[in-house]
């Protein structure tokens, strides 16, 4: 796939995220991740996990009867470790974890970003 094809695919993934976010909360690491996603037009419920234990977030989601979340942790070592811990805890509690969008963002940015907060600037630079 050529670079421009990857970028077109990335834009499609962002559109998919906008639709999915209408019904499913998005798990992110920090408020800058939220700001980046909002600048891209993603609206919805964001859950910032920076300083909250994962089991407490899972408790709250179970209490609210949330069945599925979208996982958008960063692509660095810490983000991968967080993703693994979240998947394990949430699935144990019966909460489906959508990792597809996170995976596709990583692929279609050609590993060009290390974190979700960089996604807006990555897209913006290529559009203008």
From Swiss-Prot:
Residues in Toprim domain copies: 23-105
A GO molecular-function annotation: metal ion binding
Binding site for Mg(2+) 1: 29, 74
Superkingdom per UniProt: Archaea
Xref: SUPFAM superfamilies: Toprim domain (SSF110455)
Cofactor(s) in the UniProt record: Mg(2+)
Keywords tagged on the record: Magnesium, Metal-binding
InterPro entries, per database record: TOPRIM_dom (IPR006171), TOPRIM_RNase_M5-like (IPR034141), UPF0292 (IPR022972)
Cofactor annotation comment: Binds two Mg(2+) per subunit.
Pfam families per record: Toprim
Binding-site residues for Mg(2+) 2, renumbered to this chain: 74, 76
Alphabetical list of Gene3D superfamilies matching this protein: 3.40.1360.10
HAMAP family: UPF0292
Family as reported in the entry's similarity comment: Belongs to the UPF0292 family.
Record protein name field: UPF0292 protein MJ1624
Organism, as annotated: Methanocaldococcus jannaschii (strain ATCC 43067 / DSM 2661 / JAL-1 / JCM 10045 / NBRC 100440) (Methanococcus jannaschii)
Lineage: Archaea, Methanobacteriati, Methanobacteriota, Methanomada group, Methanococci
């Amino acid at each position: 796939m050529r670079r421009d094809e990857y970028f077109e695919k990335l834009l499609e993934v962002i559109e998919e995220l906008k639709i999915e976010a209408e019904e499913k909360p998005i798990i992110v690491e920090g408020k800058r991740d939220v700001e980046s996603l909002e600048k891209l037009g993603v609206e919805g419920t964001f859950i910032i996990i920076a300083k909250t234990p994962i089991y407490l977030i899972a408790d709250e989601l179970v209490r609210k009867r949330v069945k599925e979340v979208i996982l958008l942790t960063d692509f660095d070592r810490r983000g991968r470790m967080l993703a693994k811990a979240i998947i394990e805890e949430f699935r144990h509690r019966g909460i489906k974890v959508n990792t597809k969008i996170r995976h596709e963002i990583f692929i279609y940015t050609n590993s060009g970003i290390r974190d979700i907060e960089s996604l807006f600037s990555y897209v913006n630079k290529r559009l203008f």
